[in-house]
C-alpha cells in the first residue's frame, strides 16, 4: 500500500523575515531536486512558495513577515533511499536557513515525519486531543463484529494492544489498569460475589480468579472480542477465556442491561460490581450525548444489584478532562440512592496519559 510521508521544518527567526532573500537562497536547493517553483505573494502577509517534482513529491514554504518560516514536504513513503533523500533535503534547507538568517534563528523545530495512509496506522489521539504515535509494527487481528471493529496491534513497547472502534482499550503491558479498576490491591475478594460488566479482554477476570472469590460473573456482549483476546492477548487473560465456565466464574455472552434488570428483579446482589464498559464521555453536554444516558442507566442498575456494603469500580477518563469528570461526579449525585465516591489517578502505560478511576459505594443507612 502506497503511503505519504509528511515532514515539517519550522524556523522562528529573531527578526522579521526577508522573504525575497529566503526564496532566492533556497531556490538552488530545490532546483537540485528537480523541483519547479511557484510563488504567491501577499503585500502584508508574506510569501507562499510551492515546489513540485515529477515524482509526485512537493513542498510548501510559507514565509510570514513577523519571522515564522514553515516548510511542509510530502513524498511517497516508498523505500530507504527515498527517506534518506528527504532527510538530506531537510538538512540542506536547515543549514541554508541558518546561513541566510545570519545566526538570528531563534528556534528550529523539526518533528518526526508523519506517515499517512500506510498499511499500519500508528497514530491515535489522546482523550484530550493530542496526537500520539505508537511503535506499531504489525496488525495481529482486524475483524468487524456486529457491534464494533476489533483490532489487535503489536507494539514493541507495550505488546499486543486491543483497539475497539478506534479507541485504545488495553495493552498487554497494562496490568496497572486492571489493578486500578479492581481497587488497587486494597480489597479482599476471598469468598465474594463479583459482577464484571464488559471486560472482554479477560484481564480483570484473570486477576480476580487468582484471589479465590466465591463466584465471578462476567457479562460481555461481543463474542468476537473474547475470541480475539484469548488467542492474541494471553499475557493479559491467561487461559480464563478458553472456557466460558470455570470453578469460580462464568462468562455470559449477553447485553448487560437486560441481565442487570433481571438480577435487580430477582433481588440478586454482589459484593463488587466492576464496570469495564466505557470511559466517561468526552462530551460535556449530557443532554445531547446518548452515552451519558447509557452511563446513568448502568450506574442506577449497578447500585440496585450492589450490596449495601459493596463497592462499584469503574474507569473515568483522562485526568485533563476536568469538566467531563466533574459532570460524571454530578451524575453520581442523581442516582436513585445516595452514594459516596473516591478517585485515584493511575499511569496506564499504553494510554500515554494519566487516567482517573472511581470507587463508588452506598451511603450508610441512618
UniProtKB/Swiss-Prot annotation:
- Describe what happens without this gene: Mouse ES cells lacking Sms display normal growth rates but are sensitive to antiproliferative and DNA damage-inducing drugs.
Q: Which EC class is this protein assigned?
A: transferase
Q: Give the Phosphoserine positions (modified residues).
A: 57
Classification via SUPFAM superfamilies: S-adenosyl-L-methionine-dependent methyltransferases (SSF53335)
Q: Gene3D superfamilies under this entry? A: Siroheme synthase, domain 2 (3.30.160.110), Spermidine synthase, tetramerisation domain (2.30.140.10), Vaccinia Virus protein VP39 (3.40.50.150)
Q: What is its EC number?
A: 2.5.1.22
Give the molecular function GO annotations: spermine synthase activity
Query: For binding S-adenosyl 3-(methylsulfanyl)propylamine, which residues are annotated in this chain's numbering?
Result: 148, 220, 255-256
Q: What is known of its domains?
A: Composed of 3 domains: the N-terminal domain has structural similarity to S-adenosylmethionine decarboxylase, the central domain is made up of four beta strands and the C-terminal domain is similar in structure to spermidine synthase. The N- and C-terminal domains are both required for activity.
Family per record:
Belongs to the spermidine/spermine synthase family.
Task: Write the protein's name.
Answer: Spermine synthase
Instruction: State the organism of origin.
Output: Mus musculus
Amino acid at each position: 500500500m502506497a503511503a505519504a510521508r509528511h515532514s515539517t521544518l519550522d524556523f522562528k527567526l529573531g527578526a522579521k523575515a526577508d522573504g525575497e532573500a529566503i526564496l532566492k537562497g533556497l531556490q538552488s536547493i530545490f532546483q537540485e531536486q528537480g523541483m519547479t517553483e511557484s510563488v504567491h505573494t501577499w503585500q502584508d502577509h508574506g510569501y507562499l512558495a510551492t515546489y513540485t517534482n515529477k515524482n509526485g513529491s512537493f513542498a510548501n514554504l510559507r514565509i510570514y513577515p513577523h519571522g515564522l518560516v514553515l516548510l511542509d514536504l510530502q513524498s511517497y513513503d516508498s523505500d530507504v533511499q527515498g527517506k534518506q533523500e528527504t532527510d538530506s533535503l531537510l538538512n540542506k534547507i536547515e543549514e541554508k536557513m541558518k546561513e541566510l538568517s545570519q545566526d538570528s534563528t531563534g528556534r528550529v523545530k523539526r518533528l518526526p515525519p508523519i506517515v499517512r495512509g500506510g498499511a499500519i496506522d500508528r497514530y491515535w489521539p489522546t482523550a484530550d486531543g493530542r496526537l500520539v504515535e505508537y511503535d506499531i509494527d504489525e496488525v495481529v487481528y482486524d475483524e468487524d463484529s456486529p457491534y464494533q471493529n476489533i483490532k489487535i496491534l503489536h507494539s514493541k513497547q507495550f505488546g499486543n494492544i486491543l483497539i475497539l472502534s478506534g479507541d485504545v482499550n488495553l495493552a498487554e503491558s497494562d496490568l496497572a489498569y486492571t489493578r486500578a479498576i479492581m481497587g488497587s490491591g486494597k480489597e479482599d475478594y476471598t469468598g465474594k460475589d463479583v459482577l464484571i460488566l464488559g471486560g472482554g479482554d479477560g484481564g480483570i477476570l484473570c486477576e480476580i480468579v487468582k484471589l479465590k472469590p466465591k463466584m465471578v460473573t462476567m457479562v460481555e456482549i461481543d463474542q468476537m472480542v473474547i475470541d480475539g483476546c484469548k488467542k492474541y492477548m494471553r499475557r493479559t487473560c491467561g487461559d480464563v477465556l478458553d472456557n466460558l465456565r470455570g470453578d469460580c466464574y462464568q462468562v455470559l455472552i449477553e447485553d448487560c442491561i437486560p441481565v442487570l434488570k433481571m438480577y435487580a428483579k430477582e433481588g440478586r446482589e454482589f459484593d463488587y460490581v466492576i464496570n469495564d464498559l466505557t470511559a466517561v464521555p468526552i462530551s460535556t453536554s449530557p443532554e445531547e450525548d446518548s452515552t451519558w444516558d447509557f452511563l446513568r442507566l448502568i450506574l442506577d442498575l449497578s447500585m440496585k444489584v450492589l450490596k449495601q456494603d459493596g463497592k462499584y469500580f469503574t474507569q473515568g477518563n483522562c485526568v485533563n478532562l476536568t469538566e467531563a469528570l466533574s459532570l460524571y461526579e454530578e451524575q453520581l449525585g442523581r442516582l436513585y440512592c445516595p452514594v459516596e465516591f473516591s478517585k485515584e489517578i493511575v499511569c496506564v502505560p499504553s494510554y500515554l496519559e494519566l487516567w482517573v478511576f472511581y470507587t463508588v459505594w452506598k451511603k450508610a443507612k441512618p
